[in-house]
């Protein structure tokens, strides 16, 4: 438990004896009692307590809206535009990668449909005993309506007794509407503070500006284009009240960037993972986790988090070393923090009763050139020898300047964190760990068609299977040209999750991708012979580099075996 870790590892000033701890708890209880007096005029009779009427009222009441208002109850809006209006909408998408033209026409106070498990409504909270939170929202050149809708959503769904403040951190925006106009608007709202960076900091350091100024016991980080579901805050704070070393994420519901439809789901949420490119991925909850749950609304352990929305004890955040300040833009920082939470004694969880809608932009609205360096820092500090699996699939990452990680490694040693093998074995056993045997991974190059390699680039990142494997000029950058020949005689395309294996369907001669199986089917087995011949076990035919008939490109096909160099293949780890 983290409590033991604090006594064993924290500085002397934080080591308290049993008497001091009891005194501290007594003071906390007295503080809660005084707050109860000042807010309600009555004194609770003492434990066991039940929530008092009215104690969960939000900071601001939500104003009534017409039932037919645009986007009411999270409904999709599809405007029929033409001429100048259509041009303005397209311009807003180009600038923000979100349909801001539509967002500006949807109320800042719209209600969302109920998208949580009905059991969540039955949960009772002891509001006087829950910690108060500071909600930190960093932004850079955000559109007016999406930013203000986020702020109002927090104020109109968060119990007043639980919300210490909302801290908006302006990361050196240069848009006119985010200057005096924003300051004037926010000055009229209760519990809202605006902090402005004096230079462009990037998401990580901007969030740290907010965290350092926060007065709440819990830090709740949100992105700047969110809408909070009713009852989103209480489950996060309740869980941290129960276990201070738990970092808790809400269920992230999608808000469509174009129609602003709220696509929440009351069913089982997904959890976070990653692939060996160190790209965050979503996954279904594994059976082992389901078996440990007593109720469908129990917290769900997650190997990683998306990173934009989570709550953490401020004290525990500081103990863990907060964010890695060597990181700037978003990307990679979420995996680094996820690894650190787990390896250093905490838990990372998703709470099914906490839902927050998030507008996922069409694509990133600004450059994230330093995201690769973030991933390299995460690999260097936390992944031990497994970082080589990342570098094999991202050769360019070896050349990426990533700064000094000496202090982060000292932090890992100070906190006596576990190794990455423990993380893979204990936290994420579902992730396949590649073998990467020398001479059997990298670019699979053809000997006859010189300079051409197997290449697979599915059009949909979320559906890796079902498309033909092709041949393109070797580029040496891994990714879509990285393959591994395993001891199970598979040719794995394992840069992404879920992993895919080259397959030949019965009666056909084209090589396509299908999901790898626990037991290797015959149509996924290939024999790589010493002379480089690649034989498909089921058909007994050889893989040959062949010109495609329709588009003059090249692709591998099954052909009767010959002595042709076009049927000989070899792995090459990097471009010479």
UniProtKB/Swiss-Prot annotation:
One Pfam family it belongs to: Ricin_B_lectin
Renumbered residue ranges of the record's region Disordered: 38-58
GO biological process, one term: protein glycosylation
Binding site for substrate: 171, 200, 330, 366
Annotated segments matching region Catalytic subdomain B: 299-361
Disulfide bonds: 120-353, 344-417, 453-474, 501-516, 542-561
Function as written in the Swiss-Prot or TrEMBL entry: Catalyzes the initial reaction in O-linked oligosaccharide biosynthesis, the transfer of an N-acetyl-D-galactosamine residue to a serine or threonine residue on the protein receptor. Has activity toward non-glycosylated peptides such as Muc5AC, Muc1a and EA2, and no detectable activity with Muc2 and Muc7. Displays enzymatic activity toward the Gal-NAc-Muc5AC glycopeptide, but no detectable activity to mono-GalNAc-glycosylated Muc1a, Muc2, Muc7 and EA2. May play an important role in the initial step of mucin-type oligosaccharide biosynthesis in digestive organs.
Endpoints of the signal sequence: none
Top class in the EC scheme: transferase
Topological region Lumenal: 38-576
Predominant location: Golgi
Entry cofactors: Mn(2+)
Source taxon at top rank: Eukaryota
TM helices/strands, residue ranges: 20-37
Entry's localization field: Golgi apparatus membrane
Cytoplasmic side: 1-19
Binding site for Mn(2+): 223, 225, 358
Protein name (Swiss-Prot/TrEMBL): Polypeptide N-acetylgalactosaminyltransferase 12
One cellular component term from this protein's GO annotations in UniProt: Golgi membrane
Catalytic activity field: L-seryl-[protein] + UDP-N-acetyl-alpha-D-galactosamine = a 3-O-[N-acetyl-alpha-D-galactosaminyl]-L-seryl-[protein] + UDP + H(+); L-threonyl-[protein] + UDP-N-acetyl-alpha-D-galactosamine = a 3-O-[N-acetyl-alpha-D-galactosaminyl]-L-threonyl-[protein] + UDP + H(+)
Residue ranges occupied by any Ricin B-type lectin domain in the UniProt entry: 440-572
SUPFAM superfamilies: Nucleotide-diphospho-sugar transferases, Ricin B-like lectins
Region (Catalytic subdomain A): 130-239
Annotated GO MF terms: carbohydrate binding; metal ion binding; polypeptide N-acetylgalactosaminyltransferase activity
């Amino acid at each position: 438990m983290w409590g033991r870790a604090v006594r064993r590892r924290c500085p002397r000033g934080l080591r308290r004896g049993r008497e001091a701890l009891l005194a501290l708890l007594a003071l906390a209880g007295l503080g809660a009692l005084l707050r109860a007096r000042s807010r309600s005029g009555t004194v609770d009779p003492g434990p066991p307590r039940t929530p008092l009427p009215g104690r969960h009222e939000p900071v601001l009441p939500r104003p009534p809206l017409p039932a037919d208002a645009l986007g009411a109850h999270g409904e999709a809006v599809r405007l029929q535009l033409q001429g100048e209006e259509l041009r303005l909408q397209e311009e807003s998408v180009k600038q923000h990668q979100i349909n801001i033209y539509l967002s500006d026409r949807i109320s800042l106070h719209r209600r969302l449909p109920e998208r949580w498990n009905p059991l969540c409504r039955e949960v009772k909270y002891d509001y006087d005993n829950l910690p108060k939170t500071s909600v930190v929202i960093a932004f850079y050149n955000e559109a007016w309506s999406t930013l203000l809708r986020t702020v109002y959503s927090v104020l109109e769904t968060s119990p007043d007794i639980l919300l210490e403040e909302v801290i908006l951190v302006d990361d050196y925006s240069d848009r006119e509407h985010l200057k005096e106009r924003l300051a004037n608007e926010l000055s009229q709202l209760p519990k809202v503070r605006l902090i402005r960076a004096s230079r462009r900091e990037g998401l990580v350091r901007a969030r740290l500006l907010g965290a350092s100024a926060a007065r709440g016991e819990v830090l709740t980080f949100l992105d700047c284009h969110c809408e909070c579901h009713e009852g989103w805050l209480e489950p996060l704070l309740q869980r941290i009240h129960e276990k201070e070393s738990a970092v808790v994420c809400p269920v992230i519901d999608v808000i469509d960037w174009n129609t602003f439809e709220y696509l929440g789901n009351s069913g089982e949420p997904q959890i976070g993972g990653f692939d060996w490119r160190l790209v965050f991925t979503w996954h279904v909850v594994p059976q082992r986790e389901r078996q440990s749950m007593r109720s469908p609304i129990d917290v769900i352990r997650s190997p990683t988090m998306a990173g934009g929305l989570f709550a953490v004890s401020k004290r525990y955040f500081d103990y863990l070393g907060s964010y890695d300040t060597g990181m700037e833009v978003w990307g990679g920082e979420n995996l680094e923090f996820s690894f650190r939470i787990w390896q250093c004694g905490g838990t990372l969880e998703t709470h099914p009763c906490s839902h927050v809608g998030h507008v996922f932009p069409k694509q990133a609205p600004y450059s994230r050139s330093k995201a690769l360096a973030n991933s390299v820092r995460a690999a260097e500090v936390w992944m031990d020898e497994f970082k080589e699996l990342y570098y094999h699939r991202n050769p360019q990452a070896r050349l990426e300047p990533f700064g000094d990680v000496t202090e982060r490694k000292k932090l890992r040693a100070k906190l006596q964190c576990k190794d990455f093998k423990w993380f893979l074995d204990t936290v994420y056993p579902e992730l396949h760990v590649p073998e990467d045997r020398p001479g059997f991974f990298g670019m699979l190059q053809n000997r006859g068609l010189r300079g051409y390699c197997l290449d697979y680039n599915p059009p949909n990142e979320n559906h890796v299977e079902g498309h033909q494997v092709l041949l393109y000029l070797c580029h040496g950058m891994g990714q879509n040209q990285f393959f591994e020949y395993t001891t199970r005689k598979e040719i794995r395309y394992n840069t992404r999750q879920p992993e895919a294996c080259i397959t030949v369907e019965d009666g056909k001669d084209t090589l396509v991708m299908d999901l790898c199986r626990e037991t290797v089917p015959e149509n996924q087995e290939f024999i790589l012979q010493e002379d480089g011949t690649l034989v498909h076990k089921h058909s007994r035919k050889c893989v040959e580099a062949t010109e495609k008939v329709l588009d003059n490109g090249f692709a591998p096909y099954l052909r009767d075996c010959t002595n042709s160099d076009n049927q000989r293949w070899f792995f090459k780890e990097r471009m010479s």
